[in-house]
Every structure is written in C-alpha cells, then in structure tokens.
C-alpha cells in the first residue's frame, strides 16, 4: 500500500504538470533520518537503545541490560539526513522548469553496519557471531544485540539504493 500510494502521487503530479502546465515537481526521497524519526524505525530503535543503555554498558552492568533485538541485519539502505533532504526539496522548487528528482546518497549500508557505528561511537566495539536468526553482537563477552525473527518484515526489500544524479 505504501509503495502504491507513492506511485499514484508520482503519476498524478506528473499528470497535473503536463495537463495544466503546473509547476509541480516529484521529489523521490530515499530513507532520511533525524532525531524526529518515529520510534518504530530501525535507526531510531538502535540509537534510542544505545542512549538508554550507555551508562549501564560503561559500568559493565550487563545483567541489567535487555539485548537490542533487531530483524534483518543484511538489509541494505540508502540513508541520508533529513536536513540535507529538506534542502534538496527547496532546491528542487528553485528550478526554472518543473521536473522529477531522486534525493538519495547513492550508497548503501546494512543495519549491521549502522549498529557497529553506534557501538564504535560509544567506544564499545562488537564482535559478531552466528548467522541469520542465530546472529548475535557481543561486547565484553556479553550478548548485547540479538536477531529476532519477529522483527523481519513479511515483504522485505533487500536493497534500497537511489541514483541521485537527477
């Protein structure tokens, strides 16, 4: 439904632009993140968990920590920052002629890479072991990240990569 609605919006915008000579542009925005991201999105879930557990991790109170549970660690996403995407939207509207644009970084990173970056930033490197639903992230001999099949999407898209050339 989400993709179908996006496709409908794309074509109705294009149709109005051509039929009524409207200044109407499509901005096709790939994943963009900020502190305002919804709590159920994976990036927010990861950063929130890290923030909530940082002091316990530093104090090595692992028994008080419930592991971070995630779905597909091999999902590749083209993640950018919302502030950059808002600037891109403004620039799209400054063009002399209306057109359609892709707003993306042009590179992908896995969920696993995102988790690793967060833990590295906290000064707590992870070691990974296992594969698939048996994969875990371990810090100081303690499991702090677990893959949980309940977080796998029923129709997961393996790779989302945008071409920002226009």
Could you tell me what each predicted segment is?
Residues 25-27, 103:
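Short glycine/serine/threonine-enriched helix-capping/active-site loop
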Residues 37-166:
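C-terminal substrate-binding subdomain of Rossmann-fold SDR/epimerase-dehydratase oxidoreductases
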């Amino acid at each position: 439904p989400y993709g179908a609605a996006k496709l409908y919006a794309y074509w109705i915008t294009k149709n109005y632009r051509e039929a009524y000579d409207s200044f109407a542009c499509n901005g096709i925005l790939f994943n963009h993140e900020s502190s305002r991201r919804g709590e159920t999105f994976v990036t927010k879930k990861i950063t929130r968990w890290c923030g909530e557990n940082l002091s316990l991790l530093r104090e090595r109170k692992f028994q008080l920590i419930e592991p971070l549970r995630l779905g597909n660690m091999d999902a590749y996403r083209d993640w950018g920052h919302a502030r950059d995407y808002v600037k891109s939207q403004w620039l799209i509207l400054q063009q002399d002629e209306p057109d359609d644009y892709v707003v993306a970084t042009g590179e992908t990173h896995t969920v696993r890479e995102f988790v690793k970056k967060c833990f590295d930033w906290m000064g707590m490197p992870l070691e990974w072991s296992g594969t698939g639903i048996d994969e875990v992230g371990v810090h100081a001999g303690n499991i702090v990240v677990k893959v949980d099949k309940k977080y796998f999407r029923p129709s997961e898209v393996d790779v989302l990569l945008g071409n920002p050339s226009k």
